Amino acid sequence: MLHYAYVKNINSNSTYRYAIVFASRAVADEWWHAVSTSAIVKFSDSIRRVNAQFYTHDVGQANAADSLTVNGVATQFLGKVFFTLLDDLGGRQLSIIPPLHFADHISENSFYIRSKVSPYEYWYCPLLSNSNATNLVYVSRTERTRFRVCLAEKGTAGTVMIGSDEIVITVPSLSRSIDVTDSGQVILATAPQSGLKFSDLLSKFTVGPTVYKDGQSLDTRELLYTDDGEKWELA
């Protein structure tokens, strides 16, 4: 699905205003990662991300549109992103981009994790009567648990996460992290799963068998890790 954003010139209220079209939400976040970490300092200093659909640039330093054509910035996105220069303030026209409703993938924020195909199915860690969590993670249509997702690298709170980033998923109230057993069961552990990437969270987990107790369905299913997983999203 296409992703849209605006760019505004911080030095003027009337010029160098753009609408950007990205091939996908992931491309938008990856473009921002490339720009914000570029060794071409005039670009990393010029362009700022206000939120997922609004950026600013200091045209006196660097024009955001040029990020696609200046070597060392974000030329790898030339075929996946385009900028359209909007009318100046006096043009009396504005191209309204469609609002997109989603959770921004910011490191150390907390999220519900739900199925992209069946958005009423959520990751869930049930609590026992003694307030201790079971060690298994489930998928439920009636219950849900908030998880904190953060980059594995320390000191990166507030950073936009992209697919290649290594992450840690925790349940803050329990001081436990998501881990995966050798058989693929998703569990809560004191140490997180090593090498887990953000793209794995979104595509390498699947729903297992229904859980029964005393012959009765508990309306939950096991969560499993697999290379051929389902699509998940943060909410």
Region annotations inferred by a language model:
Residues 1-235:
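Lectin-like carbohydrate-binding module/patch detector with strong preference for beta-trefoil
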